[in-house]
């Protein structure tokens, strides 16, 4: 958790809960220390998702969640753009890559994982 000395950061170079909460970014990472090693999770957004790059909800307890519909929650009611109506038979697909790591990856390493994910993505769902 961030309270115990962990770090939250995103693809924009922002760091810390206050700067990353509500930020729109291609990825968000939370890394902390457990005993003598660093561990964490990186969540990577896909360009085909609604509202890419997504808005992120993070907190000091280590919560990290994508929120593609959080425009007005994070930018205020006047921002608009967070409402989406889906037709009854419409299919909505959201793709994210989750990387659980037992290290403290650099921002460049996470960016490379993001680029590999978006360049090689081909998923077929029947």
Could you say what each language-model-derived stretch is?
Residues 3-79:
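Trp/Gly-enriched beta-strand surface patches
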Residues 44-126:
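Beta-strand-rich recognition/accessory modules
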């Amino acid at each position: 958790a961030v309270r115990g000395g962990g770090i939250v950061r995103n693809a924009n170079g922002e760091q810390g809960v206050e700067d990353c909460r509500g930020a729109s970014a291609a990825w968000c990472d939370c890394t902390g220390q457990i005993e003598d090693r660093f561990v964490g999770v990186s969540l990577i957004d896909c360009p085909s998702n609604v509202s890419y790059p997504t808005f992120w909800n993070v907190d000091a307890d280590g919560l990290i969640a994508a929120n593609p519909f959080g425009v007005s929650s994070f930018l205020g009611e006047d921002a608009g753009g967070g409402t989406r109506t889906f037709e009854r038979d419409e299919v909505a697909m959201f793709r994210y890559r989750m990387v659980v790591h037992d290290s403290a990856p650099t921002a460049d390493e996470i960016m490379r994982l993001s680029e590999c994910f978006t360049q090689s993505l081909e998923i077929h769902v029947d």
